[in-house]
């Protein structure tokens, strides 16, 4: 007779359930703080596993990038179509001090701008700020009907589009290279550069819906804790930042 396993025998404690451990008991919550350039500094919260042994929680948090709607940061629905990227540069207690990492438009806003009977002008330029951040800035614009125009279409000639694009690149290089990253952020919120492009190209061809649609951070200088703390205020405990007015003027350019 073949000898096999008796399935009727009890198999010890296999039937007992394992103790369920809540994974959130091993995690800590941290507050994300935006720079004082934005009105609302409390972006939200994020979590990470607690520091254990040689694993430090701060190392896992540094470099994290968060995408936030500009309407939430400014408390105004007028900015709902723009997204700001914030990067964690320093951990202070339970606060994460962030810095500007990029800007982008929502896809629905970009699609709503493109229409028939008009020409689209796009330009991009790689430029370094005065505090050594290398950025790639993308601009978008559309041709507009001239005063007393009867014709339905507003198409521009290729030569005119080249002139407009050249002017756009020139303005973006000038505006970005003469300011710091914090000053550039203050310009991007009220769309100062877009209005400057629209005003300067009137003699070439009238434009409408001129926007800086994207800002990409390519390279950043060596980390400086002092400048980051200055960007967040000395105590970095204020919940409100300073309001950027729509009629913003760059103080640095005036002094130069």
UniProtKB/Swiss-Prot annotation:
It comes from the Eukaryota. The modification N-acetylalanine is found at residue 2. InterPro entries: Ribosomal_eS1, Ribosomal_eS1_CS, Ribosomal_eS1_euk. Keywords: Acetylation, Cytoplasm, Ribonucleoprotein, Ribosomal protein. GO terms for biological process: translation. It is found in: Cytoplasm. SMART domains: Ribosomal_S3Ae. Pfam families: Ribosomal_S3Ae. One of its GO terms (molecular function) is structural constituent of ribosome. GO terms for cellular component: cytosol; cytosolic small ribosomal subunit; hyphal cell wall. The keyword Plastid does not apply. Its main location: cytoplasm. PANTHER family: 40S RIBOSOMAL PROTEIN S3A. Belongs to the eukaryotic ribosomal protein eS1 family. Component of the small ribosomal subunit. Mature ribosomes consist of a small (40S) and a large (60S) subunit. The 40S subunit contains about 33 different proteins and 1 molecule of RNA (18S). The 60S subunit contains about 49 different proteins and 3 molecules of RNA (25S, 5.8S and 5S). This is Small ribosomal subunit protein eS1.
